[in-house]
Amino acid sequence: MNKTERQLAILLELQRRKVLKGEELAEKLETSVRTIYRDIQALSESGVPIIGAPGHGYS
């Protein structure tokens, strides 16, 4: 799965479920938690409204 496919998968997962932790996304997408964090940061910087709360996850 390339970066674009992974970022799209993150968006789709966040739309399906209200809140997801980075660890859950990493397991689902078979990648590292750090990669998920970088992808979420890139999505946020490009204007995608992703809310992250430490200890609670992303929505």
Label the model's feature ranges.
Residues M1-S59:
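Short, basic/aromatic recognition patches that contact phosphate-bearing ligands
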